[in-house]
C-alpha cells in the first residue's frame, strides 16, 4: 500500500524525523528513532542534508511520496548519507518496523543556513 495524498500532505508539514529530539543547535539536530515491532513513524519530510546510522539489526518498509514502497534489511552500523538534500529535492516517507525486535537509529540533520525547520 502506498502513501495517500492526505498522508503526503500531512507529512509535508511534519518535521519530526525521529521519536526523540536529543540535541538542537543553530546548525544541526540529533534525533533518536526507536520503533517497536509493528510500529510506524508517521509520514514526515526530509528537506535538508542528513544522515542516519542504525544501531540494531532489523527489517522495515518505507513508503515514499513518489509511490515507491521499499523493504529494507538493516545491519548494525548501516549508515546512509543525504548530503545534497534541499527543500526542492526533499521527500516525504514513513518507516514501519516489520521485524521482530526494536529498530533503533540515530539521525543527524544539518542546517547550512543556521535555522532548523
State what each model feature region is.
Residues 94-99:
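Asparagine-centered strand-capping/turn motif at beta-strand->loop junctions
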Amino acid at each position: 500500500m502506498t502513501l495517500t495524498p492526505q498522508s503526503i500532505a500531512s507529512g509535508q508539514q511534519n518535521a519530526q524525523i525521529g521519536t526523540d529530539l536529543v540535541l538542537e543547535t543553530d546548525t544541526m539536530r540529533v534525533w533518536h528513532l526507536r520503533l517497536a515491532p509493528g510500529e510506524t513513524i508517521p509520514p514526515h519530510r526530509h528537506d535538508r542534508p542528513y544522515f542516519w546510522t542504525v544501531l540494531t539489526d532489523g527489517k522495515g518498509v518505507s513508503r515514499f511520496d513518489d509511490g515507491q514502497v521499499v523493504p529494507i534489511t538493516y545491519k548494525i552500523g548501516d549508515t546512509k548519507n543525504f548530503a545534497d538534500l534541499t527543500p526542492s529535492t526533499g521527500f516525504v516517507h514513513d518507516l514501519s518496523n516489520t521485524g521482530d525486535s526494536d529498530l533503533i537509529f540515530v539521525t543527524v540533520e544539518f542546517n547550512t543556513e543556521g535555522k532548523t525547520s
